C-alpha cells in the first residue's frame, strides 16, 4: 500500500470533505462527546422538566437561550458531516428545502433534550396521546379516523403499549435516538408537499392549531314579546361570496298593512296585486303591498315604525333617510298588472326640495324606455292577453311614464302619483318603429284603454343615528383545534444489529422503514379524506361548519369535492402522431380547468385565505398530485401558466400504486410557514426515544429488540379537492388513432 493510501486511510475524520451526509461519522462524533459537560445531551438537562408544556421554549428566557444553544450546536455538527445543503435557485423551492432541513435539526435537538432524562420524556409522550377535554366552545378536541377505503393506519391511541418503556434499556441508545430523529423527521417529496412536517414537543393533550375567526352579529328578536332572543353570528368569510350578509335591513321602512284593514285604502287593490309577507332581521313579520298612486298618506304611520320603536331599534325622533329612491312601479295593462324595476334608472333617487320645507325630498322620475314584449310576464306569472298578442305579432311596446311626488323626511307626510302614462312607440322584431295605424298594432293598442300607474314601492330607511354609529358589530375569537398524537406500531431490529453493524447502520435501517411508512400513510390519509369529502358533499352539505367534515378551515369555507373520469381514447381524435402529445396534454388540462375554475369560485377559498392570513393579496396555490405517468402530461408546451395568468400551480407525483391513474388537485400555500393552517395538510412529528424493549413474537416468545416507536399524525386542514381518474394513455399514445377511426366507419 502506498504512503498516500495510508494517509487517506488514517486521515482524521474532521479533515474529510463531505459531499453527502455521513450518518456513521455524525454518530461517531456524538459518541465521542456524549459524556462531556458541553455535549448536546448534557445541555438538555435544564429543559427536560418543561418540555411537555405548551409554551415550551417561548416564555422563559433561559429556556429560549438553552434550546437555541443546543439547536446551534446540532446545526454545526450536522454541517460538519455534509448534512443536506439548500442549493436550488428557485426562491420557493429554497424556502421549502430550508424548512425541511430546519425541521430535521429541530427533531434531533428535541431528541437530544429527551436523552438528558428519558424517563421524564417518556412520561411526556404518554400525555400527548391522550385527549384533553375542554368545556370551552372555541376549543375543539379532534378525534381522527385512521381507516378508510384506501386502507388503515395501525396506531395505538391513549398511550396503549407505552408500558414497555418502563423497563430500563440495557444499552445506551442515546446517539441512535438523535440520529434516528434527524433522519426520520421527513417524508418523501410527495408527502412533504401535501403534508409539510412540523416538529412539536410532546404537549399534554396533543398539538393545538389556532384559526382566527371573525363573524358579524345579527340581532334577532322574539316576534311577540320583543325580548332579545340571541345574537346570530355569520361567518365573515361568507360575506366575500354573499354581499347581502353585510346588508343592514334592520331599519328599513316597510309599509305595513293593518290586519284589521284600517289602512287598506292606502294600498293597491288586493285583487290586482295580492299582499305578501316578509320577515326582517329582527324576526318581525310584516304584511305589505304596493302603495296606491295619487293618494296622500303618512308614510311613517303606515309602516313598521311602531314595531321598531317597541323593540328599541328606533326612537320617536328618528326621521326618514334622505338617501331613498323609487324602487318599483306597477302598471295596469289590459286588465292585469306588470311590475317594472326602476331603482337603477336615472332620476329615481330622492332629491332635496329646493322650494319650501328643507326637510322635504322630491322625486321627479320619467322614462320612455319601459319595455313590454312577448317575454314580459304579469305579476301572477301569466303571459296571456296583450302579452301573448305581442309575442304572436313579434312586437314590443315602449311606455312613457312620468311619476313624482314629495315626502316630509321628519313627518312622513307624502303624496306620489303619475303625471302621464302612454305608449310612446311600437317596435317590430328588427327594432323599427311601427305605424300605429297598422292593423296588428292597432289591435294591441285598443286593448290598453286602462293603461295607468296604479302603485309604487320605495326603497327607504330610517336615519336612526345610534344604529348608524354602531355599524357592523363583529365577534372575533381564536378557534383552537387540539389533536392528540397517536403512537404507531414499533419498528424493530434484532439486538445483535447494534454489535455487528454499529449504531450508524441501526439508524439507517430504522429510518428507511419509518420514512417509507410515513410517506405511505400520507397517501392513505389523503385518499381516505377524499372519500370523506365525497360523502359529505354528495349528501348536499355546502355551508361552513366544523364537525361535519375534518379540517380546521371547514369552520369558515364551503366543503368542495368534484370527481371526473376522463377516457382519453374517447376525446382524442388526432390524425397526426406529432400532434398527439399536445392533444393529450390539452385534454387533461381542459378537463381540470372545467372543474377547478367554478370550484375555486363556489368554495369561497380565496376569501378564506385572505381573512385567515390578514393579507388581501393572499391566494391559494393549486398542487397537482398524480402518479408518475400523468405527471409527464401536466405542462402546456411553451407556456407554464397551466391554469392561466390568475391561479398559481405546482406539480408533485408519487409511485405509490394507490395513486395509479389518479390526478388530485388541492389548494395550499405556496410557501408554508411553521404549523401553517393554510397548508392543505400537516404532518406533526414528535421526537421519540430508541430503546431495547421486550417484544412478543408469535404470542409466546419474548425477545429484546431495538425499537423505535413513532409518534406522528397527518392532519387535513382544507376541505377542498378535485379528483380525476384518467385512462387510455396506452391506446392513445401507443396505437394509431386515425386507423381506428377509419375502422369505425367501415360498413
Swiss-Prot record:
UniProt-annotated location(s): Virion
Quaternary structure, per UniProt, is:
Homohexmer.
Does this UniProt record's set of keywords contain Ribosomal protein?
A: no
Know the name of this protein? Major capsid protein
Its job: Capsid protein self-assembles to form an icosahedral capsid with a T=27 symmetry, about 120 nm in diameter, and consisting of 1560 capsid proteins. The capsid encapsulates the genomic DNA. The 12 pentameric vertices of the capsid are occupied by other proteins.
What positions are marked as the site Cleavage? Answer: 24-25, 54-55, 84-85, 97-98, 118-119, 136-137, 163-164
Show the GO cellular component annotation of the record.
viral capsid
| Record keyword Plastid present | no
Enumerate the UniProt keywords alphabetically: Capsid protein, Virion
| UniProt modification remark | Cleaved by the capsid maturation protease during capsid maturation.
Looking at the record's lineage, which domain of life comes first?
Viruses
Amino acid at each position: 500500500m502506498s504512503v498516500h493510501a495510508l494517509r487517506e486511510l488514517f486521515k482524521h475524520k474532521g479533515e474529510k470533505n463531505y459531499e453527502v451526509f455521513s450518518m456513521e461519522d455524525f454518530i461517531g462524533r456524538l459518541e465521542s462527546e456524549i459524556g462531556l459537560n458541553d455535549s448536546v445531551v448534557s445541555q438538555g438537562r435544564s429543559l427536560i422538566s418543561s418540555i411537555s408544556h405548551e409554551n415550551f421554549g417561548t416564555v422563559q428566557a433561559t429556556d429560549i437561550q438553552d434550546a437555541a444553544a443546543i439547536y446551534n450546536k446540532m446545526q454545526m455538527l450536522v454541517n460538519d458531516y455534509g448534512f443536506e445543503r439548500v442549493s436550488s435557485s428557485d426562491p420557493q423551492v429554497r424556502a421549502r428545502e430550508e424548512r425541511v432541513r430546519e425541521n430535521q435539526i429541530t427533531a434531533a435537538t428535541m431528541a437530544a433534550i429527551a436523552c438528558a432524562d428519558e424517563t421524564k420524556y417518556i412520561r411526556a409522550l404518554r400525555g400527548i396521546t391522550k385527549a384533553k377535554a375542554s368545556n370551552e366552545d372555541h376549543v375543539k378536541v379532534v378525534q381522527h379516523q385512521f381507516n378508510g377505503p384506501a386502507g388503515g393506519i395501525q396506531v395505538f391511541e391513549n398511550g396503549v403499549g407505552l408500558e414497555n418503556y418502563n423497563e430500563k434499556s440495557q444499552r445506551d441508545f442515546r446517539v441512535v435516538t438523535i440520529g434516528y430523529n434527524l433522519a426520520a423527521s421527513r417524508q418523501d417529496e410527495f408527502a412533504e408537499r401535501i403534508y409539510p412536517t412540523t416538529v412539536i414537543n410532546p404537549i399534554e393533550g396533543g398539538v393545538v392549531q389556532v384559526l382566527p375567526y371573525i363573524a358579524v352579529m345579527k340581532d334577532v328578536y322574539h316576534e311577540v314579546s320583543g325580548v332579545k332572543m340571541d345574537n346570530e353570528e355569520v361567518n365573515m368569510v361568507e360575506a366575500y361570496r354573499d354581499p347581502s350578509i353585510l346588508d343592514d335591513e334592520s331599519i328599513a321602512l316597510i309599509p305595513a298593512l293593518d290586519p284589521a284593514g284600517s289602512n287598506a285604502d292606502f294600498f293597491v287593490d288586493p285583487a290586482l296585486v295580492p299582499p305578501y309577507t316578509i320577515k326582517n332581521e329582527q324576526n318581525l313579520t310584516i304584511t305589505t303591498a304596493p302603495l296606491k298612486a295619487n293618494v296622500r298618506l303618512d308614510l311613517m304611520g303606515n309602516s313598521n315604525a311602531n314595531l321598531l320603536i317597541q323593540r328599541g331599534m328606533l326612537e320617536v325622533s328618528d326621521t326618514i333617510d334622505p338617501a331613498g329612491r323609487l324602487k318599483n312601479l306597477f302598471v295596469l295593462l289590459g286588465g292585469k298588472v306588470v311590475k317594472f324595476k326602476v331603482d337603477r334608472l336615472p332620476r329615481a333617487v330622492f332629491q332635496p326640495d329646493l322650494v319650501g320645507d328643507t326637510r322635504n325630498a322630491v322625486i321627479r322620475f320619467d322614462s320612455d324606455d319601459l319595455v313590454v314584449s312577448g317575454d314580459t310576464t304579469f305579476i301572477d306569472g301569466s303571459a296571456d292577453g296583450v302579452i301573448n298578442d305581442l309575442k304572436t305579432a313579434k312586437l314590443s311596446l315602449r311606455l312613457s311614464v312620468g311619476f313624482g311626488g314629495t315626502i316630509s323626511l321628519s313627518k312622513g307626510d307624502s303624496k306620489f302619483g303619475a303625471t302621464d302614462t302612454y305608449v310612446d312607440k311600437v317596435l317590430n322584431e328588427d327594432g323599427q318603429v311601427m305605424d300605429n295605424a297598422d292593423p296588428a298594432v292597432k289591435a294591441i293598442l285598443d286593448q290598453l284603454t286602462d293603461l295607468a300607474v296604479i302603485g309604487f314601492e320605495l326603497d327607504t330607511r330610517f336615519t336612526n343615528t345610534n344604529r348608524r354609529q354602531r355599524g357592523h358589530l363583529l365577534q372575533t375569537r381564536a378557534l383552537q383545534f387540539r389533536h392528540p398524537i397517536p403512537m404507531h406500531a414499533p419498528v424493530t431490529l434484532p439486538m445483535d444489529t447494534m454489535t455487528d453493524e454499529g449504531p450508524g447502520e441501526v439508524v439507517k435501517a430504522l429510518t428507511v422503514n419509518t420514512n417509507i411508512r410515513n410517506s405511505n400513510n400520507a397517501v392513505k390519509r389523503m385518499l381516505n379524506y377524499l372519500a370523506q369529502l365525497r360523502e359529505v358533499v354528495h349528501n348536499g352539505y355546502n355551508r361552513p361548519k366544523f364537525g361535519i367534515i375534518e379540517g380546521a378551515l371547514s369552520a369558515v369555507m364551503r366543503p368542495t369535492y368534484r370527481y371526473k373520469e376522463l377516457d382519453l381514447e374517447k376525446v382524442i381524435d388526432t390524425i397526426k402522431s406529432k400532434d398527439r402529445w399536445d392533444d393529450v396534454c390539452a385534454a387533461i388540462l381542459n378537463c381540470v380547468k372545467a372543474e377547478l375554475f367554478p370550484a375555486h369560485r363556489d368554495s369561497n377559498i380565496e376569501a378564506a385565505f385572505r381573512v385567515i392570513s390578514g393579507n388581501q393579496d393572499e391566494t391559494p396555490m393549486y398542487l397537482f398530485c398524480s402518479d408518475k405517468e400523468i405527471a409527464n402530461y401536466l405542462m402546456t408546451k411553451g407556456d407554464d401558466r397551466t391554469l392561466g395568468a390568475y391561479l398559481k400551480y405546482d406539480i408533485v407525483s408519487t409511485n405509490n400504486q394507490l395513486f395509479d391513474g389518479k390526478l388530485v388537485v388541492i389548494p395550499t400555500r405556496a410557501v408554508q410557514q411553521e404549523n401553517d393552517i393554510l397548508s392543505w395538510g400537516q404532518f406533526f412529528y414528535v421526537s421519540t426515544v430508541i430503546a431495547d424493549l421486550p417484544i412478543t413474537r408469535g404470542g409466546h416468545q419474548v425477545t429484546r429488540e431495538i425499537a423505535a416507536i413513532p409518534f406522528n399524525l397527518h392532519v387535513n386542514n382544507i376541505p377542498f379537492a378535485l379528483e380525476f381518474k384518467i385512462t387510455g394513455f396506452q391506446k392513445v399514445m401507443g396505437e394509431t388513432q386515425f386507423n381506428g377511426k377509419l375502422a369505425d366507419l367501415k360498413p
